[in-house]
Protein backbone atom coordinates (compact mmCIF):
# COMPACT_ATOMS: atom_id res chain seq x y z
CA UNK A 1 0.00 0.00 0.00
CA UNK A 2 2.70 2.45 0.99
CA UNK A 3 4.87 1.39 -1.92
CA UNK A 4 1.96 1.81 -4.30
CA UNK A 5 1.15 5.19 -2.80
CA UNK A 6 4.79 6.18 -2.94
CA UNK A 7 4.89 5.07 -6.57
CA UNK A 8 1.96 7.32 -7.38
CA UNK A 9 3.48 10.22 -5.47
CA UNK A 10 6.77 9.75 -7.30
CA UNK A 11 5.20 9.77 -10.75
CA UNK A 12 2.83 12.72 -10.19
CA UNK A 13 5.55 15.44 -9.83
CA UNK A 14 7.33 14.05 -12.90
CA UNK A 15 4.11 14.18 -14.91
CA UNK A 16 3.42 17.71 -13.72
CA UNK A 17 6.96 18.74 -14.55
CA UNK A 18 6.59 17.40 -18.08
CA UNK A 19 3.25 19.19 -18.41
CA UNK A 20 4.76 22.48 -17.24
CA UNK A 21 7.66 22.10 -19.70
CA UNK A 22 5.23 21.52 -22.55
CA UNK A 23 3.15 24.51 -21.47
CA UNK A 24 6.29 26.66 -21.28
CA UNK A 25 7.37 25.60 -24.77
CA UNK A 26 3.89 26.39 -26.06
CA UNK A 27 3.91 29.83 -24.45
CA UNK A 28 7.36 30.58 -25.87
CA UNK A 29 6.19 29.52 -29.32
CA UNK A 30 3.17 31.82 -29.10
CA UNK A 31 5.30 34.72 -27.85
CA UNK A 32 7.80 34.29 -30.69
CA UNK A 33 5.00 33.96 -33.23
CA UNK A 34 3.39 37.15 -31.95
CA UNK A 35 6.74 38.94 -31.94
CA UNK A 36 7.38 37.88 -35.53
CA UNK A 37 3.94 39.15 -36.51
CA UNK A 38 4.47 42.37 -34.58
CA UNK A 39 7.80 43.12 -36.31
CA UNK A 40 6.68 42.06 -39.78
CA UNK A 41 7.20 45.18 -41.89
CA UNK A 42 5.05 46.71 -44.57
CA UNK A 43 6.82 47.17 -47.89
CA UNK A 44 6.12 50.81 -48.74
CA UNK A 45 4.34 53.85 -47.34
CA UNK A 46 3.97 57.51 -48.31
CA UNK A 47 3.57 59.98 -45.42
CA UNK A 48 3.72 63.55 -46.66
CA UNK A 49 1.89 65.22 -43.76
CA UNK A 50 3.90 63.51 -41.01
CA UNK A 51 6.61 64.84 -38.73
CA UNK A 52 9.05 63.38 -36.19
CA UNK A 53 6.20 62.37 -33.88
CA UNK A 54 5.54 59.50 -36.32
CA UNK A 55 9.03 57.95 -36.11
CA UNK A 56 7.83 54.94 -34.13
CA UNK A 57 5.13 54.24 -36.69
CA UNK A 58 7.65 54.40 -39.53
CA UNK A 59 9.61 51.51 -38.03
CA UNK A 60 6.97 49.12 -39.37
CA UNK A 61 7.90 49.97 -42.98
CA UNK A 62 10.74 48.79 -45.21
CA UNK A 63 10.62 51.95 -47.35
CA UNK A 64 8.93 55.27 -46.66
CA UNK A 65 8.47 58.60 -48.40
CA UNK A 66 8.46 61.62 -46.08
CA UNK A 67 8.94 65.34 -46.50
CA UNK A 68 12.44 65.56 -45.05
CA UNK A 69 12.17 69.34 -44.82
CA UNK A 70 10.32 68.63 -41.56
CA UNK A 71 12.81 66.10 -40.20
CA UNK A 72 16.33 66.38 -38.85
CA UNK A 73 19.41 64.44 -39.85
CA UNK A 74 19.16 62.64 -36.50
CA UNK A 75 15.57 61.59 -37.23
CA UNK A 76 16.69 59.98 -40.47
CA UNK A 77 19.63 58.29 -38.74
CA UNK A 78 17.20 56.70 -36.27
CA UNK A 79 15.11 55.35 -39.13
CA UNK A 80 18.23 53.94 -40.77
CA UNK A 81 19.15 52.18 -37.53
CA UNK A 82 15.81 50.43 -37.79
CA UNK A 83 16.62 49.36 -41.35
CA UNK A 84 14.11 51.71 -42.97
CA UNK A 85 14.88 53.19 -46.39
CA UNK A 86 13.98 56.89 -46.46
CA UNK A 87 13.01 58.83 -49.57
CA UNK A 88 12.21 62.52 -49.35
CA UNK A 89 9.39 64.27 -51.16
CA UNK A 90 10.58 67.08 -53.42
CA UNK A 91 8.12 69.20 -55.38
CA UNK A 92 9.89 70.60 -58.44
CA UNK A 93 6.93 71.54 -60.64
CA UNK A 94 4.61 73.55 -58.42
CA UNK A 95 4.87 75.97 -55.53
CA UNK A 96 2.87 75.52 -52.32
CA UNK A 97 1.61 78.50 -50.33
CA UNK A 98 2.46 76.91 -46.95
CA UNK A 99 6.19 76.73 -47.65
CA UNK A 100 8.42 79.33 -46.01
CA UNK A 101 9.92 80.13 -49.41
CA UNK A 102 6.54 80.75 -51.08
CA UNK A 103 6.67 84.57 -51.09
CA UNK A 104 10.16 84.51 -52.58
CA UNK A 105 9.12 82.52 -55.64
CA UNK A 106 5.36 83.17 -55.91
CA UNK A 107 5.93 85.43 -58.92
CA UNK A 108 7.15 82.38 -60.87
CA UNK A 109 3.70 80.75 -60.77
CA UNK A 110 2.29 80.09 -64.23
CA UNK A 111 -1.18 78.73 -63.49
CA UNK A 112 -3.71 77.31 -61.06
CA UNK A 113 -3.39 73.69 -59.98
CA UNK A 114 -6.81 72.07 -60.32
CA UNK A 115 -8.12 70.40 -57.13
CA UNK A 116 -5.14 71.67 -55.07
CA UNK A 117 -5.93 75.18 -53.90
CA UNK A 118 -2.68 75.57 -51.97
CA UNK A 119 -0.55 74.97 -55.08
CA UNK A 120 0.24 76.69 -58.36
CA UNK A 121 2.25 75.42 -61.31
CA UNK A 122 5.69 76.99 -61.42
CA UNK A 123 8.03 78.02 -64.24
CA UNK A 124 10.70 75.31 -64.02
CA UNK A 125 12.58 77.00 -66.87
CA UNK A 126 13.42 79.96 -64.63
CA UNK A 127 17.11 79.91 -63.56
CA UNK A 128 16.26 81.16 -60.06
CA UNK A 129 13.86 78.26 -59.51
CA UNK A 130 16.38 75.75 -60.82
CA UNK A 131 19.05 77.16 -58.53
CA UNK A 132 16.71 77.05 -55.55
CA UNK A 133 15.70 73.43 -56.17
CA UNK A 134 19.40 72.58 -56.51
CA UNK A 135 20.13 74.12 -53.11
CA UNK A 136 17.12 72.47 -51.48
CA UNK A 137 18.00 69.05 -52.86
CA UNK A 138 21.56 69.51 -51.55
CA UNK A 139 20.23 70.23 -48.06
CA UNK A 140 18.02 67.15 -48.16
CA UNK A 141 20.91 65.04 -49.42
CA UNK A 142 23.04 66.20 -46.48
CA UNK A 143 20.35 64.96 -44.09
CA UNK A 144 21.17 61.45 -45.26
CA UNK A 145 18.11 60.52 -47.30
CA UNK A 146 18.32 57.45 -49.51
CA UNK A 147 16.60 59.07 -52.45
CA UNK A 148 14.21 61.65 -53.84
CA UNK A 149 10.49 61.31 -54.57
CA UNK A 150 10.03 63.90 -57.30
CA UNK A 151 6.58 65.42 -57.70
CA UNK A 152 4.88 67.50 -60.39
CA UNK A 153 6.90 66.78 -63.49
CA UNK A 154 3.33 66.96 -64.79
CA UNK A 155 3.94 70.67 -65.22
CA UNK A 156 5.04 69.60 -68.71
CA UNK A 157 1.56 68.18 -69.32
CA UNK A 158 0.09 71.49 -68.15
CA UNK A 159 2.50 73.59 -70.22
CA UNK A 160 4.16 71.44 -72.93
CA UNK A 161 6.71 73.98 -74.10
CA UNK A 162 10.33 73.17 -74.89
CA UNK A 163 11.60 75.45 -72.13
CA UNK A 164 9.54 73.53 -69.55
CA UNK A 165 10.85 70.20 -70.83
CA UNK A 166 14.44 71.43 -70.67
CA UNK A 167 13.89 72.92 -67.22
CA UNK A 168 12.63 69.63 -65.78
CA UNK A 169 15.49 67.77 -67.43
CA UNK A 170 18.11 70.12 -65.99
CA UNK A 171 16.66 69.78 -62.48
CA UNK A 172 16.46 65.98 -62.64
CA UNK A 173 19.93 65.51 -64.07
CA UNK A 174 21.35 67.67 -61.30
CA UNK A 175 19.59 65.59 -58.63
CA UNK A 176 20.88 62.40 -60.26
CA UNK A 177 24.46 63.58 -59.56
CA UNK A 178 23.94 62.80 -55.86
CA UNK A 179 24.00 59.10 -56.72
CA UNK A 180 20.74 58.46 -54.88
CA UNK A 181 17.44 56.97 -55.99
CA UNK A 182 15.26 59.36 -57.99
CA UNK A 183 11.61 58.30 -58.11
CA UNK A 184 9.35 60.35 -60.37
CA UNK A 185 5.76 60.51 -59.16
CA UNK A 186 3.53 60.48 -62.23
CA UNK A 187 5.01 62.64 -64.97
CA UNK A 188 4.14 60.16 -67.72
CA UNK A 189 3.89 62.83 -70.45
CA UNK A 190 7.36 64.15 -69.66
CA UNK A 191 8.94 60.70 -69.19
CA UNK A 192 7.46 59.39 -72.45
CA UNK A 193 8.77 62.45 -74.31
CA UNK A 194 12.24 62.02 -72.80
CA UNK A 195 12.31 58.35 -73.81
CA UNK A 196 11.14 59.25 -77.32
CA UNK A 197 13.97 61.75 -77.69
CA UNK A 198 16.83 59.90 -76.04
CA UNK A 199 15.86 56.22 -76.13
CA UNK A 200 16.37 55.64 -72.40
CA UNK A 201 15.32 57.23 -69.12
CA UNK A 202 18.16 56.23 -66.80
CA UNK A 203 19.74 59.69 -67.02
CA UNK A 204 16.78 61.29 -65.23
CA UNK A 205 15.33 58.64 -62.90
CA UNK A 206 15.81 55.32 -61.15
CA UNK A 207 12.14 54.62 -60.45
CA UNK A 208 8.56 55.66 -61.03
CA UNK A 209 5.61 55.97 -58.68
CA UNK A 210 2.18 56.03 -60.25
CA UNK A 211 -0.99 57.05 -58.48
CA UNK A 212 -4.48 55.73 -59.21
CA UNK A 213 -3.76 52.84 -61.55
CA UNK A 214 -6.51 50.70 -60.03
CA UNK A 215 -8.36 53.26 -57.94
CA UNK A 216 -9.76 56.71 -58.66
CA UNK A 217 -10.70 59.86 -56.78
CA UNK A 218 -13.85 61.91 -57.34
CA UNK A 219 -12.67 65.32 -56.15
CA UNK A 220 -16.16 66.81 -56.39
CA UNK A 221 -17.70 64.31 -53.97
CA UNK A 222 -14.53 63.44 -52.08
CA UNK A 223 -15.02 59.71 -52.66
CA UNK A 224 -12.88 56.83 -53.92
CA UNK A 225 -13.80 54.49 -56.74
CA UNK A 226 -12.39 52.05 -59.27
CA UNK A 227 -10.30 53.34 -62.16
CA UNK A 228 -11.68 53.08 -65.69
CA UNK A 229 -10.31 50.20 -67.76
CA UNK A 230 -9.00 52.62 -70.39
CA UNK A 231 -6.96 54.64 -67.90
CA UNK A 232 -5.81 51.52 -66.07
CA UNK A 233 -4.61 49.89 -69.30
CA UNK A 234 -2.78 53.07 -70.30
CA UNK A 235 -0.89 53.27 -67.02
CA UNK A 236 -0.14 49.54 -66.96
CA UNK A 237 1.43 49.79 -70.41
CA UNK A 238 3.38 52.90 -69.36
CA UNK A 239 4.69 51.20 -66.21
CA UNK A 240 5.63 48.05 -68.10
CA UNK A 241 7.71 50.20 -70.43
CA UNK A 242 9.40 51.89 -67.47
CA UNK A 243 10.13 48.53 -65.88
CA UNK A 244 11.60 47.28 -69.14
CA UNK A 245 13.94 50.29 -69.01
CA UNK A 246 15.26 48.96 -65.71
CA UNK A 247 13.62 51.35 -63.24
CA UNK A 248 11.75 50.42 -60.08
CA UNK A 249 7.96 50.67 -60.19
CA UNK A 250 5.77 51.70 -57.24
CA UNK A 251 2.00 52.14 -57.03
CA UNK A 252 0.06 54.51 -54.79
CA UNK A 253 -3.66 53.77 -54.60
CA UNK A 254 -6.52 55.51 -52.81
CA UNK A 255 -9.22 53.07 -51.75
CA UNK A 256 -10.89 51.34 -48.82
CA UNK A 257 -12.28 48.56 -51.06
CA UNK A 258 -10.70 45.29 -49.94
CA UNK A 259 -11.30 43.57 -53.28
CA UNK A 260 -9.55 46.40 -55.08
CA UNK A 261 -6.69 46.31 -52.58
CA UNK A 262 -6.18 42.60 -53.31
CA UNK A 263 -5.73 43.37 -57.01
Give the residues covered by each predicted segment.
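N-terminal Sec-pathway targeting helices
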Residues: 5-20
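Short, Lys/Arg-rich, polar N-terminal cytosolic tail immediately upstream
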Residues: 1-2
Amino acid sequence: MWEALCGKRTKQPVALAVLFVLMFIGVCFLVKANQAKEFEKNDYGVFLNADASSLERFKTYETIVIDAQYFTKRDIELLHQNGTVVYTYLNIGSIENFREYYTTYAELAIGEYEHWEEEEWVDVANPDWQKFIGQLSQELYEKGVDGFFIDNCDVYYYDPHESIFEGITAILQNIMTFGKAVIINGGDTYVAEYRERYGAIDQIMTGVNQESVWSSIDFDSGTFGEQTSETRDYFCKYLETCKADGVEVYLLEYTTNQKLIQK
